[in-house]
Design a protein with these regions (language model features):
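Extreme N-terminal starter segment of soluble prokaryotic enzymes
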Residues: 1-8
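Short beta-strand scaffold segments in enzyme catalytic cores
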Residues: 90-92, 104-108, 136, 202, ...
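Active-site catalytic loop in hydrolytic enzyme cores
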Residues: 95-169, 178-191, 261, 267-268, ...
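Residue-level detector of high-confidence beta-strand sites
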Residues: 105, 114-119, 137, 172, ...
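CN hydrolase (nitrilase-like) catalytic-core segments centered on the catalytic cysteine
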Residues: 69, 73-87, 154-246
């Protein structure tokens, strides 16, 4: 696959829904609209499924959302989003594992194959969760992909782990309540595009709601490309305006042939091609 059309969607969690199924219908409609408009791969924001919280009667809202999504909605939702040659990163949702622990999990449909990615590094507000055990690399129609959830994109050790793994597309679902959070995610996503020589797509949660985690949200959709000669005449930074509400989309034509030609061309300063060196701290 030489080109991939990527749809990065914000999601306003404050838009009311009458039932859990109505909320899920809205999510599905956005994904299918993006597919119908030509997107191959769609990404939705972190914690968008916490929008189900108003339908949870039990005191522990996180576990309640986990049960509502995975037990009730997911068996009906999954078949609607399994489509050959199409993909979606369905935001994130609390997942209650057999060990009784909560994880912040991104459900991923890669054509007809299902996979997931758990968030690795947690904010102080995610004390009820445990971090995931590792990051998964996967291939979507021949494109080497990785999902890195919000704070994880800010961790340079993760970028070091991914060095040399052939990552072509990094996808970053995110949720933050401050402009500084938007800035941190954006600046670090841009850095990952340079360090790994790959394309990076980010999308944020928007809107206000009554929630233990996502009461206020701000953000945008953004895409970054490597700062290398092959991309000199290409847009290397695209973004929607920063917003506090509304559903917005950034559709990006990811030129993979250009990326692969760049990787095969020697003689240019490129941090993604430098081998890791053993270093020591001088004191």
């Amino acid at each position: 696959m030489d080109r991939l059309t990527l749809a990065l969607l914000t999601f306003d969690v404050g838009v009311p829904a009458s039932t859990p199924d109505a909320f899920a219908d809205r999510v599905c409609a956005q994904v299918r609209e993006a597919w119908d408009d030509g997107a191959d791969l769609v990404v939705l924001p972190e914690f968008l499924w916490m929008g189900l919280e108003p339908f949870v009667a039990e005191e522990d809202k996180l576990r309640g959302v986990a049960r509502l999504f995975w037990t009730d909605l997911w068996p009906r939702l999954a078949p609607r989003l399994a489509q050959a040659d199409k993909g979606v990163v369905l935001g994130t949702v609390p997942f209650l594992g057999p060990d009784g622990l909560l994880r912040n999990r991104a459900p991923i449909w890669d054509g007809l194959a299902f996979r997931h990615q758990d968030k690795l590094h947690l904010t102080p507000w995610e004390a009820a969760f445990v971090g995931g055990d590792g990051v998964g690399l996967w291939s979507f129609r021949g494109v080497r992909c990785v999902v890195v959830i919000c704070l994880d994109v800010e961790i340079p050790e993760l970028a070091s782990l991914l060095r040399g793994q052939g990552v072509e597309l990094m996808l970053v679902p995110s949720a933050t309540e401050t402009l500084l959070g938007v800035e941190r995610v954006g600046r670090c996503a841009d850095a990952r595009a340079v360090e790994l020589g790959c394309h990076v797509g980010v999308c944020h949660l928007l809107g206000r709601t009554t929630s233990v985690l996502i009461d206020e949200n701000v953000g945008r959709a953004a895409a970054f490309a490597p700062s290398q000669a092959a991309f000199r005449d290409e847009p290397r930074h695209l973004a929607t305006p920063v917003c506090t509400e509304g559903d917005h989309a950034l559709t990006v034509d990811v030129d993979l042939a250009l990326l692969r030609r760049h990787r095969a061309t020697p003689g240019e300063t490129d941090p993604s091609k430098l081998p890791a060196r053993p270093l020591r701290l001088l004191t």
